[in-house]
């Protein structure tokens, strides 16, 4: 059985030996809602100016030390401004988690999985390199790109979800950056400094 036989109900080939036109019907594609879209939408409806200073947010490690340890430059201001948006992210994640138990853990796990995919890609690239480096050195030399890749993967999830279509671009970008900033603080993106 040829390939055209297997798909004969979904496509037709029309043309001569020199020119072939392929008409193919795309399978039904149904978008699904994404929990992370809900977080970004709720963040977009809040004023971020009324937040507590970062000194009121507790951390189990020094954020500046983590920024230095991972050599973060481009996204450093986003992380340093965590106090301006961190409480809102925490409140919204908590609210969504109360509405659907386990949501916060799933969202942070998704972000951590995206981070691990980036690390896996870097390991693959590094394995082909003449100069073999420790993975932390690879992470350090690519930390800003890793953060950017995680941001872009989340934006893709939201853009492809059924509940992420009606957001303003600015709300989408800022919301995703705030969530990734939170994930950095929660050690779901980049490495915790060795003590």
Which sequence ranges carry the predicted segments?
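Charged, helix-prone or intrinsically disordered regulatory segments positioned adjacent to compact structured domains
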Residues: 26-48
């Amino acid at each position: 059985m040829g390939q055209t036989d297997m798909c004969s109900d979904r496509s037709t080939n029309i043309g001569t030996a020199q020119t072939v036109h392929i008409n193919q019907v795309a399978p039904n594609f149904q978008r699904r809602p994404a929990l992370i879209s809900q977080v970004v939408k709720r963040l977009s409806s809040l004023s971020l100016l009324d937040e507590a200073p970062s000194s009121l947010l507790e951390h189990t490690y020094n954020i500046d030390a983590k920024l230095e340890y991972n050599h973060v430059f481009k996204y450093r201001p986003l992380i340093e401004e965590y106090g301006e948006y961190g409480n809102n992210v925490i409140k919204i994640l908590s609210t969504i988690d109360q509405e659907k138990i386990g949501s916060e853990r799933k969202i942070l796990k998704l972000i951590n999985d995206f981070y691990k995919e980036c690390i896996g890609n870097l390991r693959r690239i590094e394995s082909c390199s003449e100069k073999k480096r420790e993975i932390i050195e690879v992470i350090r030399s690519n930390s800003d790109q890793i953060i950017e890749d995680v941001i872009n993967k989340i934006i893709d999830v939201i853009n492809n979800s059924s509940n992420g279509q009606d957001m303003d671009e600015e709300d989408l970008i800022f919301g995703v950056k705030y969530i990734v900033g939170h994930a950095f603080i929660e050690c779901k993106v980049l490495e915790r400094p060795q003590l």
